[in-house]
UniProtKB/Swiss-Prot annotation:
Source organism per UniProt: Mycoplasmoides gallisepticum (strain R(low / passage 15 / clone 2)) (Mycoplasma gallisepticum)
Task of the protein: Catalyzes the formation of N(7)-methylguanine at position 46 (m7G46) in tRNA.
The protein's Enzyme Commission number: 2.1.1.33
Name the UniProt record assigns to this protein: tRNA (guanine-N(7)-)-methyltransferase
This protein's pathway: tRNA modification; N(7)-methylguanine-tRNA biosynthesis
GO molecular function, one term: tRNA (guanine(46)-N7)-methyltransferase activity
Lineage: Bacteria, Bacillati, Mycoplasmatota, Mycoplasmoidales, Mycoplasmoidaceae
InterPro entries: SAM-dependent_MTases_sf, tRNA_(Gua-N-7)_MeTrfase_Trmb, tRNA_methyltr_TrmB_bact
Keywords carried by this UniProt record: Methyltransferase, S-adenosyl-L-methionine, Transferase, tRNA processing
Length: 213
């Protein structure tokens, strides 16, 4: 469903202390801490819950839609009290070169835009070009978690991952919520309103965890 843009959303979000620019992001990246990045944070349901649950971890979200960020700010009353959550209003594809090498311990890709048309394949966040970007900014043994309701996008991700010898698949499933509750793929899984919607519809959720070797 298309989100109706809020007028001057980009100006309103800049007043929130958790919204930072790329330059400020570099100063927030503490090499002594565990740093996690979510690309395409949406309304922030996932990263917000992660930051609350894990105060010792620094969470960084990138979201290019100002209206979506504003909805997150308005919805999350405790947002500004969190000192370990930072949101960058930008497009990862345009700013990835600004990130230092080996600066993140973990990357999350949650319900990314599937870009279903073949001519848009390079825009998919699991395309080879993006995987190479992730490899550069991940620390040694850094982990990537990718979760999607879109089966075609998941199959594409598997194809891209299998084409690279330097990637090791740790675990994956085509039906996350059919697994036993003790399964590692469900450990610390955050169910957002978006994901719950698909669970209610009995739609399978795909998930893969992998790293570079």
């Amino acid at each position: 469903m298309r989100i109706r843009n809020i007028r001057d959303a980009h100006l309103k979000i800049n007043k929130a202390k958790n919204i930072i620019g790329v330059d400020n992001l570099k100063t927030k990246l503490d090499p002594k801490k565990f740093n996690a990045l979510e690309i395409g944070s949406g309304k922030g349901g996932f990263i917000y819950q992660k930051a609350i649950t894990n105060p010792g971890i620094n969470y960084f979200g990138i979201e290019k839609n100002a209206t979506v960020i504003l909805k997150m700010i308005n919805k999350s009353e405790l947002l500004e009290q969190l000192t370990n959550l930072f949101i960058v209003h930008d497009d990862f594809a345009l700013i990835d070169h600004e990130f230092p090498n080996a600066c993140f311990d973990q990357i999350y890709l949650n319900f990314s835009d599937p870009w279903p048309k073949k001519r848009h394949a390079k825009k998919r966040l699991v395309d080879l070009a993006f995987l190479n970007k992730y490899q550069r900014i991940l620390k040694a043994d850094g982990i990537i978690e990718f979760k999607t309701d879109n089966d075609q996008l998941f199959n594409y991700a598997i194809e891209m991952i299998n084409s690279l010898e330097q990637i090791k698949i740790i675990a994956y499933t085509n039906d996350l919520h059919s697994l036993d509750s003790s399964d590692a793929l469900l450990k610390n899984n955050v169910i957002t309103e978006y994901e719950q919607r698909f669970i209610n519809l009995k739609k399978n959720i795909n998930k893969i965890v992998f790293k570079f070797i």
